[in-house]
Amino acid sequence: MAILLPDLPYAYDALEPYIDAETMTLHHDKHHATYVANANAALEKHPEIGENLEVLLADVEQIPADIRQSLINNGGGHLNHALFWELLSPEKTKVTAEVAAAINEAFGSFDDFKAAFTAAATTRFGSGWAWLVVDKEGKLEVTSTANQDTPISQGLKPILALDVWEHAYYLNYRNVRPNYIKAFFEVINWNTVARLYAEALTK
């Protein structure tokens, strides 16, 4: 078996006008596909470690040194993007009561959470991701990572992710990342967030 590129759960143009079809096509078919190909190439060198990227990236020191950085970059890139696609929706969804309560407890209000997440996404220098994660105590926190690093490697469980690499927004938003972040909040799939939150509390 090999890691497979997942299909998008909607059409390439389904998120317009917030995320354009050309960006989605390039992002999924080229960028994500490259991470998958490179992760598979690395894993082929060490079949003995298996292909469970979540397990491997939860403890990167167990990854053989000669493929460690490749799996951090490309395995992380695959996991991050596979999650990202699930967290976007053409249909409007609402924050569930459970997630809203957790957000209010952690941040004070939804607006305060949105401000914290926006700040994390805006101030992430260069390429990376902004995250809403569940920590080891089951509490929510906002964080960001560089490049394709995943919060899984820090013992955190991601439930919301925003790709702030320029390839995710530059065709439509040019250098104005804040406008892309604002648009992201229009297409979040809060049903997926709720599912991931429930799973994070039980696993």
Curated annotation (Swiss-Prot):
Keywords: Iron, Manganese, Metal-binding, Oxidoreductase. It is an enzyme of class 1 (oxidoreductase). Mn(2+) binds at residues 27, 81, 163, 167. Destroys superoxide anion radicals which are normally produced within the cells and which are toxic to biological systems. Catalyzes the dismutation of superoxide anion radicals into O2 and H2O2 by successive reduction and oxidation of the transition metal ion at the active site. This is Superoxide dismutase [Mn/Fe]. The lineage of its organism: Bacteria, Bacillati, Bacillota, Bacilli, Lactobacillales. One of its GO terms (molecular function) is metal ion binding. It comes from the Bacteria. Fe(3+) binds at residues 27, 81, 163, 167. It comes from Streptococcus mutans serotype c (strain ATCC 700610 / UA159). PROSITE patterns: SOD_MN. GO terms for cellular component: cytoplasm.
